[in-house]
């Protein structure tokens, strides 16, 4: 008689979960941040709100964002005026857009990742799809399976309404799947479209304006698996350890509510303070077993919720300015793309490390950390091990 342990052992991979490929995609419509307040107040018929517009201009100027990419063009917004009002019932119009655009943008990123991976898509065993943009059944995971022509028995996991921390969540789940299913190859896709959150300005809901100044559209895809096939699969980063925690005394810090008016966000002013207060504990838990206490000796991939969060984390930990370089570059070029952001930063870091002639994918360093922050206030932590270039 065979024991349970004898059955389980050959089902598990030998090595750690490894990121084997990364692909990214954005809508064609590029929006320059410097002129966005003029466009935003004009398209929402709010040009008479001059004081509010000046406030929004200051938000955009301080955002450290140069440009963003958005599915919503001037033409689409003119055809859907309910999206341009502050709280007009508009969920049907928003849903009609995102249930098509979210999987379409996800496919664009996935095709790039699969091409870099170099293996046939028939070898994909699992699919994780994550979006905060719209809900449907069957979900975006099903739609992507059809769009890519994946096998019908691919094991799918659909994550809706997680928010900005979810780039860490999908990595945590992919790690568990890859390491506990020998030979598994997991396609991970995060796709975010701001059509679900766009709305006109209001004097009484300034935290909504913060979102209008920060959020952009984008999709990122990864292939994750353990025990890479030599000379065919090329490791980029290894995932060594993961954790998720709810920051104490943070209830209501970041909330999102899906209503007839779309997805509305509420933020407390102290979100940067809450993140910076709790990040040290997360780092100790993650890196004490490795004997690492100098956080300037590791590479950093942090969700760029906004410049204030990055500034306070740098100050709290005494980080050198270059530690957040990849994060700030992605924020500058794309804005806050919610769950997709940290995956864009992974891509940016490995490419820049190669361009700069460094000897590892992690800016020449061996160990690194990936952080996701979002509703809850929830913090995701992933310890990464770089790969020699």
Swiss-Prot record:
Alphabetic keyword roster: Acyltransferase, Flavonoid biosynthesis, Transferase
Biological processes, Gene Ontology terms: flavonoid biosynthetic process; polyketide biosynthetic process
Superkingdom field: Eukaryota
Pathway field: Secondary metabolite biosynthesis; flavonoid biosynthesis
Function description: The primary product of this enzyme is 4,2',4',6'-tetrahydroxychalcone (also termed naringenin-chalcone or chalcone) which can under specific conditions spontaneously isomerize into naringenin.
PANTHER family: CHALCONE SYNTHASE 7, HYDROXYMETHYLGLUTARYL-COA SYNTHASE
Catalytic activity from the UniProt record: (E)-4-coumaroyl-CoA + 3 malonyl-CoA + 3 H(+) = 2',4,4',6'-tetrahydroxychalcone + 3 CO2 + 4 CoA
Active site: 164
Protein name as it appears in the record: Chalcone synthase 1
Entry similarity comment: Belongs to the thiolase-like superfamily. Chalcone/stilbene synthases family.
A molecular function (GO) term: naringenin-chalcone synthase activity
EC number: 2.3.1.74
